[in-house]
Design a protein with these regions (language model features):
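Short, aromatic/His-centered strand-loop micro-motif at the edge of beta-sheets
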Residues: 560-580
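Short beta-strand/loop motifs in extracellular/secreted proteins, especially
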Residues: 15, 26-30, 528-531, 579, ...
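Beta-rich carbohydrate-recognition and catalytic domains
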Residues: 2-268, 272-368, 382-430, 452-501, ...
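Short tryptophan-centered beta-strand motifs in secreted/extracellular beta-sheet-rich domains
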Residues: 378, 520-522, 577-594
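Ligand-recognition surfaces built from glycine- and aromatic
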Residues: 409, 609-635
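Extracellular/lumenal carbohydrate-interaction signature centered on repeated Trp-anchored short motifs
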Residues: 10-13, 511-516, 571-577
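Secretory/extracellular carbohydrate-interaction modules
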Residues: 500-558
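Extracellular Ig-like/FN3 beta-sandwich strand-entry sites
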Residues: 59-63, 578, 609-611
Length: 635
């Protein structure tokens, strides 16, 4: 790539140019000139840094030339304007690799590509993972997320940021949090601003409804380690405040590892403030973090009897470090168990409030093979307490890797502290790659986002795409002792477009889908077999043809892939009586919902460029089928 190049841009109403640059040699610098070639500013990259975030004031409503010398700008945008929460940042394509874009592409030019979804949230470009800090604040929903502006893969973590009025259409805001400064200097260390959550607070830091709030209090993990040396890991929890929905205060530490026996994995704080019941002190807020704890800390009788705080319902899987890992390839640590560590703090939630360790609210001995939880959650819903956690480095007996598990029960007041008495447990999604779920409360609803990681190997680096996608927002409920999930009502109101016409041939009923993005709703009258061809495509890694189906055979309903690395995985939904099937297929991702959310299954799948096709054959009676265009969200 060239390390000396220039681009011309229009500043419009923006006052700040933000560039995320990597050094290519000595004397790395950015120069700004006006339309007459006169130099406006020159900024050298600090000598010690290999990466740098330039913040350069620029005049409004002029044309300027931005010149890069001995560096490459990996990510860039204009920020700071009137009504930034409505206008958003203006993306600038300064990475020479993304040469198919205009210098200042529109949202339509960025997202209207078959390699990108139309209705699911993605950043402009680069890597994205976990949803963070979900909340509603002063009339807008805030979505923060793990982000690497420097490349297509995971690296030192920043927090990206977007807002929405309706949970569907999003506005991109400036990057919110950055890695620790030393990570820009020494490439031997990695880490950054890891995942966390949000609480909306009033002017006195008391938790309150988001539309009445004065600020967002955020909690997150700071991570630091020497690359390749897990024994060097340091993780601790911090807090910071956002008062205007855009900018952030200085962070303050709030929770360190409790003792030397505590797992090095100690991250992803999720704070809840509105819980109640015998085990809850209403004057305190509660935080769960992901970790693993020594088995020796747990009473053997308590484990064998599934006492409060213990889950023993397993799924007969194995420990592995990768999605294709075979049994016995990697060795688990049987001296530890995945656990959710519980902390509490007295309200109001000042930055220096003391968080008291309450012990493990839940430990999963049924999945002890897993290394640790990630992205834990604990909340109350429909009269029950629900815990959610992703099981790291675990593959279940059906072959699914790092699934997210839910636990439903009651929070008990024990002598050791609050403990979840688990009554039922299962997977949150029967597909693959739906990970890092985070929920938040919204006027009586419990809404959740997940992140799609690429376990099916659908993503190949190429210009002008992103690597990372959020799920549709789902609303959770507890029904008959099980956690259910279904897209929020706004998804149906905003995304469903024109109805498509049905056609028939000797192979069944089919619908031609413009731009390969559609919603399908089918009501079934009986338990007979069916086959639904959701999408076809070309495998991006080897060029072979692929298919994605939903099948029912002998009472078992499952997703089936052909031509992918997941062909040997059994995506069994676990549901026997299926009467309603909903499918959201969005160019390269599918989300399936059975029986109004009784089960959900999803995965990445790269569909055909151009128009797609939905096709089905049913042995029994189909009461009705409705197929609609899935409208795009970027405008």
């Amino acid at each position: 790539m060239p390390d000396n190049y220039s681009v011309a841009i229009e500043t419009g109403g923006y006052r700040l140019l933000e560039l995320f640059a990597e050094r290519c040699g000595d004397d790395a610098a950015i120069t700004i000139t006006d339309g007459d070639g006169h130099q406006i500013a020159s900024h050298a990259m600090p000598v010690a840094e290999r990466r740098h975030h330039f913040l350069i004031p620029v005049p409004t409503n002029v044309r300027i030339t931005v010149s890069a010398h001995r560096l490459t700008v990996r990510f860039a945008y204009l920020s700071e304007c009137e009504n930034l929460l409505d206008e958003g940042v203006r993306f600038i394509s300064m990475n020479p690799y993304d040469n198919e874009w205009d210098t200042q592409p529109t949202l339509e030019q960025i997202y209207d590509r078959f390699a990108r979804p139309a209705a699911h949230f993605e950043p402009f470009a680069r890597w994205m993972n976990d949803p963070n800090g979900l909340c509603r604040f002063q009339g807008r929903y805030h979505l923060f997320y793990q982000f690497n502006p420097y490349g297509f893969g995971w690296d030192n973590m920043h927090w990206g940021h977007a807002v929405s009025r309706d949970l569907v259409h999003w506005t991109h805001l400036p990057i919110f949090l950055e890695p620790q400064p030393e990570l820009h200097i020494d490439e031997r260390i990695v880490g950054g601003a890891f995942s966390g959550s949000a609480v909306t607070v009033d002017a006195c830091d008391n938790p309150c409804k988001g539309d009445d709030a004065a600020a967002i209090r955020l909690y997150l993990t700071r991570h630091l380690e020497t690359r390749g040396d897990e024994s060097s890991v340091t993780e601790y929890q911090t807090t910071c405040l956002c008062e205007d929905g855009v900018h952030v205060s200085v962070e303050s530490p709030v929770a360190l590892r409790v003792n030397d026996g505590f797992g090095f994995d100690f991250r992803d704080p999720k704070v809840e403030t509105g819980m109640s019941g015998e085990a809850i002190n209403p004057e305190r807020a509660y935080m769960v973090t992901a970790t693993n704890l020594p088995v020796s800390e747990f009473d053997t009788d308590a484990v064998s009897s599934a006492a409060p705080g213990i889950s023993v319902q397993g799924t007969d899987g194995w420990f592995t470090c990768g999605p294709q890992g075979r049994p016995g390839t990697d060795k688990p640590n049987m001296d530890t168990v995945p656990a959710m560590a519980l902390f509490s703090a007295k309200k109001p939630l000042k930055r220096n409030v003391t968080w008291q360790y309450e012990g493990p609210v839940l430990a999963d001995f049924g999945h002890q093979l897993s290394r640790t939880y990630e992205c834990p959650d604990l909340f109350q819903l429909d009269g029950k307490t629900v815990a959610i956690g992703a099981l790291m480095h675990y593959r279940d007996k059906q072959g699914r890797f790092q699934q997210v598990r839910w636990y439903v029960g009651d929070l008990k007041d024990t002598a050791e502290g609050p403990r979840l008495q688990v009554e039922n447990s299962d997977w949150c999604d029967f597909g693959t790659g739906y990970y890092a779920m985070q929920s938040f409360a919204d006027d009586g609803r419990r809404i959740v986002f997940g992140w799609y990681t690429d376990f099916p190997a659908m993503r190949v680096e190429k210009p002008c795409i992103a690597n990372g996608m959020m799920s549709l927002p789902r609303e959770l409920h507890v029904r008959d002792g099980r956690l259910t999930s279904r897209p929020v009502k706004e998804a149906y109101e905003q995304l469903l477009g024109d109805r498509l016409e049905a056609h028939a041939d000797e192979n069944g009923t089919f619908f031609i889908v413009p731009n390969n993005a559609y919603y399908m709703d089918m009501h079934l009258a009986d338990d007979n077999d069916f086959t639904m061809l959701i999408a076809t495509g070309t495998n991006p890694t080897n060029g072979n043809s692929m298919e994605l189906q939903l099948q029912r055979r002998n009472g078992v309903t499952r997703l089936v892939t052909k031509g992918t690395v997941a062909d040997n995985v059994d995506f069994d939904s676990g549901i026997t009586d299926v009467r309603r099937v909903e499918i959201f297929f969005d160019r390269n991702v599918v989300e399936v919902f059975l029986n109004n959310g009784e089960a959900a299954g999803s995965m990445l799948f790269q569909g055909t460029d151009g128009d797609g096709e939905f096709r089905f054959v049913a042995d029994g009676k189909v009461d009705c089928v409705d197929v609609r265009v899935l409208d795009g969200i970027w405008r």
